[in-house]
A protein has these predicted regions:
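Conserved nucleotide-cofactor-binding alpha/beta core module
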Residues: 1-11
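Non-catalytic C-terminal accessory region of glycerolipid acyltransferases
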Residues: 10-156
Length: 156
């Protein structure tokens, strides 16, 4: 969804939206098949790594709400540390990022039951809310991850 926002040509945007829907549906089918086999699925809700100075990279993508609806529980996991540094020569190209040694802490929060989590958020919005409900749910996930990240960051 973040990449779609940058497409201004209506024809190209329509084409890219159709392509994006196909990818998302294939992903959803795959996630559902994994879930039915009892496999654990890890999803990065922002769709990318955070890039300092690019606050949009810290925002969760709304499609994560669809994954949440397919899943019984989720476990917020934060990864603190920076072993993949942005290239000074080409900061916009992640392929040029540098691998560096660093201390990394992987933290896990409490297991959260998806259905009640979503229902509570939507109930608090009220019936008259006309904004993007999916984005509100994902923003709450990102808020949980941010708090968790800050806690573990303080231990480093």
């Amino acid at each position: 969804s973040r990449s779609l926002a940058s497409i201004h040509d209506p024809a190209k945007r329509t084409e890219e939206e159709a392509r994006s829907r196909k990818i998302n549906m294939a992903s959803m089918r795959y996630v559902d098949a994994c879930r039915r086999r009892g496999q654990v699925i890890m999803v990065f809700p922002s769709g990318t790594r955070y890039r300092p100075g690019v606050p949009d990279t810290k925002r969760g993508v709304r499609e994560i709400d669809s994954y949440l609806r397919l899943t019984d529980v989720f476990l917020p996991i934060s990864i603190n540390g920076n072993c993949l540094r942005i290239s000074e020569d080409d900061p916009s190209n992640m392929l040029h990022d540098r691998v560096c040694q660093d201390k990394v802490i992987i933290g896990a929060g409490p297991v959260i039951e998806c259905k009640s989590f979503r229902n509570e958020i939507l109930k608090n919005l009220g019936d008259d809310y006309d904004g993007d409900k999916k984005q509100v749910v994902v923003d709450k996930i990102m808020e949980i991850l941010e708090k968790q990240h800050n806690y573990y960051e303080s231990l480093m």
